[in-house]
């Protein structure tokens, strides 16, 4: 999967989550590599707004026809919103993994972004998984 997508302007984890900072909030989702590995996503369980999350805490569960995996937060913050569309259309993550955020955090700890991977670093990391 050396051609796995990774977009500039996003930060990545080795567990295949991404974070995109927009102003004072962060959007979190899963990468193209993750959705390919999971296969058809059938259900996503996410936290309620107001929940305080620390980096590497579980944000919920993603279930596919192949497996169930935990979604981990790349950074700390407070859940301000979850993507309501995913309740009725979890497959949106398969179609557009970078445009389909799952959780929106506020009061984010931007200092934690330095511990994440850039797009180039993530592509290199994924290329070694083949």
UniProtKB/Swiss-Prot annotation:
Cofactor binding note: Binds 1 lipoyl cofactor covalently.
Would I find Ligase among this entry's keywords? no
Which cofactor(s) does the record list?
Answer: (R)-lipoate
Instruction: Tell me the ranges covered by the Lipoyl-binding domain, including all copies.
Output: 25-106
Query: Which residues are recorded with the post-translational modification N6-lipoyllysine?
Result: 66
Q: Name one GO biological process term.
A: glycine decarboxylation via glycine cleavage system
Q: Which UniProt keywords apply?
A: Lipoyl
GO annotation, cellular component aspect: cytosol; glycine cleavage complex
Give coiled-coil spans as residue ranges: none
Tell me which InterPro entries the record gives. Answer: 2-oxoA_DH_lipoyl-BS, Biotin_lipoyl, GCV_H, GCV_H/Fam206, GCV_H_sub, Single_hybrid_motif
Question: A Pfam family name for this chain?
Answer: GCV_H
Q: Which cysteines are joined by disulfide bonds?
A: none
How does it associate, per the subunit comment? The glycine cleavage system is composed of four proteins: P, T, L and H.
Enumerate the NCBIfam families for this protein: gcvH (TIGR00527), PRK01202.1 (NF002270)
The record's comment on protein family reads: Belongs to the GcvH family.
As for what it does, the entry says:
The glycine cleavage system catalyzes the degradation of glycine. The H protein shuttles the methylamine group of glycine from the P protein to the T protein.
Instruction: From the Swiss-Prot or TrEMBL record, give the protein name.
Output: Glycine cleavage system H protein
């Amino acid at each position: 999967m050396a051609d796995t997508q990774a977009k500039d302007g996003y930060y990545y984890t080795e567990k295949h989550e991404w974070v995109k900072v927009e102003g004072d909030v962060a959007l979190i989702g899963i990468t193209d590599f993750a959705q390919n590995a999971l296969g058809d996503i059938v259900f996503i369980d996410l936290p309620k707004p107001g929940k305080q999350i620390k980096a590497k805490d579980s944000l919920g569960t993603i279930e596919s026809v192949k497996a169930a995996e935990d979604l981990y937060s790349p950074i700390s913050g407070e859940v301000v919103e979850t993507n309501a569309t995913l309740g009725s259309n979890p497959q949106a993550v398969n179609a557009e993994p970078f445009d389909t955020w799952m959780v929106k955090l506020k009061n984010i700890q931007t200092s934690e972004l330095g511990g994440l991977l850039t797009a180039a670093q993530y592509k290199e990391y994924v290329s070694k998984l083949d």
